[in-house]
């Protein structure tokens, strides 16, 4: 039986997990909850056997996880993608944190009614944050060397054209194009992209 990945029907926190699963060619079943499925989720959440019921969740046999980073790390570990020594594992954790700084920066302003004002400061800081990744990629094939790791999927925009399984997924009907954030986000929310 294929593992089950449950989340809202948005890209959100689980998109890097989807990209990693697609890259690996690992079959999975997705349980998507639409914006009006709050009651459905509340009725299901305590029946799944999860220690900490939440979205996203990932059920792989007797492994039942919640929290996006725990899920991503579990899948990476299953496929020997967490680094081969303490130094590599620490660098991968560092990359996770650096990418999450950017992601949380976007989320912090995406749900704020003052988005247009706040985005100016964020966009001024963004080149400096991205420069660190550019410097790292200038001497590595991937973020942590010559082997793809899960932080690469967290920063997938830099890689999607070069990885055929990801390109295929992005062109499939399984790829969720919108919303980027939750439906209520000032930026990246709603039912359709801005025109």
From Swiss-Prot:
GO terms of biological process kind: glutathione metabolic process
Molecular function terms from GO: glutathione transferase activity
Enzyme nomenclature, EC number: 2.5.1.18
Binding site for glutathione: 7-8, 41-45, 54-55, 67-68
GST C-terminal domain span: 85-195
Binding sites annotated in the UniProt record for substrate: 111
Principal EC category: transferase
Catalytic function, reaction form: RX + glutathione = an S-substituted glutathione + a halide anion + H(+)
Domain GST N-terminal: 1-83
Role summary: Conjugation of reduced glutathione to a wide number of exogenous and endogenous hydrophobic electrophiles. GST isoenzymes appear to play a central role in the parasite detoxification system. Other functions are also suspected including a role in increasing the solubility of haematin in the parasite gut.
Protein name per Swiss-Prot or TrEMBL: Glutathione S-transferase class-mu 26 kDa isozyme
Native organism: Schistosoma mansoni
